[in-house]
Amino acid sequence: MAPHIPRSILVIDDEPSFVRALTRLLQRDGYVVETAGNGRDGLAALQRQRYDVILCDLRMPELDGRAFYAHLQQRAPSLCQRVIFLTGDSSAADNQAFFAQCGRPWLDKPCSTAAIRRAIAQVLERARRAPQLPCKC
């Protein structure tokens, strides 16, 4: 029997207390977690390692979630299916338009544990059926 390889998750968010709480939850669930405080650092992390899931805040300094996703679409489209967005304002018209356009799942902050686990499970199931190509970020 092959050894169990833990799934890896990249959390991109600029709110330290939220990142700490989310990291603790994910690690308790058996995931290996790396964090980045903005989209630019998230892209750098993707150059170093592959991730099974990317949890990305929409509003951040330097490179926000929309710009991060646009970069993935151009340079690493196979990774787009692994993104789950986080936002404190999903009802804003610009956020609704973005979510409709990109077709990716999103979670409202603060997120329930059940919602986080459900979104991750759905992304992992879909990603299992598609190859992950290297990031040219």
Predicted regions, residues:
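Receiver (REC) domain active-site loop signature in two-component systems and cognate sites
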Residues: 60
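Acidic catalytic/metal-coordinating carboxylates
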Residues: 37-41, 64-70
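Active-site residues of response regulator receiver
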Residues: 13, 57
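Charged docking surfaces used in two-component/phosphorelay signaling
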Residues: 20-28
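Alpha4 helix (beta4-alpha4-beta5 surface) of REC/receiver domains from two-component response regulators
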Residues: 67, 89-108, 114, 118
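Non-catalytic signal-transmission and effector/linker regions of two-component phosphorelay proteins
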Residues: 1-8, 112-137
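Active-site beta3 strand of CheY-like receiver
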Residues: 49-55
